[in-house]
């Protein structure tokens, strides 16, 4: 029988949900930013504030990291991810009314392209940030 993947946004053990500690630290930073700035701003404002919060908390990150997309060994495109945290977790930010499935698909593509396991999709345009966070597992 194939093992079940944990559902998104549920409490899981470290074995079920890898990199739980770092993702919780990232989410804590995002909650801090959201609690001060609130919803309704442009994505780049949240990106700048979150970058500053990562620095304050000594979290290693790369911002607007370029990744390469390949098809059968041929480079077919390049994209930029909002944040790569400690070379382990991809964080994509949004400031939209609704998180569409295409944003989730995009993050999963980035996870596959970089061979990373965990991604966070964070939408700051919500009243309670907890409602705007999705954890995706590759």
Where are these regions (language model features)?
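Intrinsic disorder/low-complexity segments
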Residues: 1-21
């Amino acid at each position: 029988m194939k093992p079940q993947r944990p559902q998104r946004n549920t409490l899981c053990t470290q074995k079920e949900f890898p990199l739980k500690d770092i993702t919780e630290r990232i989410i804590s930073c995002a909650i801090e930013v959201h609690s001060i700035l609130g919803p309704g701003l442009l994505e780049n404002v949240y990106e700048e504030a979150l970058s500053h919060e990562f620095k304050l908390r000594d979290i290693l990150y790369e911002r607007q990291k370029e990744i390469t997309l390949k098809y059968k060994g041929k480079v077919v495109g390049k994209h930029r991810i909002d944040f790569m945290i400690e070379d382990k977790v991809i964080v994509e930010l949004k400031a939209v009314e609704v998180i569409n499935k295409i944003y989730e698909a995009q993050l999963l593509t980035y996870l596959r392209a970089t061979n990373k396991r965990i991604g966070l999709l964070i939408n700051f345009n919500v009243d309670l940030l907890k409602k705007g966070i999705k954890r995706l597992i590759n």
